[in-house]
Amino acid sequence: NFAIAPPGVGRFRVNAFVQQGRIGMVLRTITTDIPKFEELGLPPVLKDVIMSKRGIMMFVGATGCGKSTSMASLLGYRNENSYVHIITIEDPIEFVHQHRNCIVTQREVGVDTDGWNVALKNTLRQAPDVILIGEVRERETMDYAISFAETGHLCLATLHANSTNQALDRIINFFPEERRSQLLMDLSLNLKGVISQRLIP
């Protein structure tokens, strides 16, 4: 997984692979302009949530349904309406944010850091206010998201799930039975919202 940006052509998210002994790849176009909140028709309440000091926002939906676009739009809104340090950890970086009122630090797994856990382990040492985790795939990553919220940071993340109910089931099932009681307490105190997206044909 990586991103490329040939001059004069555009920016693309790429997945390269081998099939039948040959190289194959899939490219998805990434718009270079970060869409405005109003252009996407996002619920107005999300403006309040993205301006929160702390908590967790989860975006869920199938691959290609616009989770990254919505998060980029919300970060763009925060970038223009507050004065904080935003850190994103992505695989790969999709939307490139310019510094507006905020300082935006973007780290790509495999390029700027060896792995998710290495990047997440050191994130709090970089004095963030808002942290974007490109994707929650395992318990350790979810642990970091909860820890970030508990220490006074706003954390945005994506998760592959078809609905908000399924997203919560997946999060709960990341953890062993003996930890679930504490997990539910942590989520009740820190989860600001689960936003489920589906593209309309």
Predicted features and spans:
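Short, flexible helix-loop junctions that flank or precede catalytic/ligand sites
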Residues: 1-201
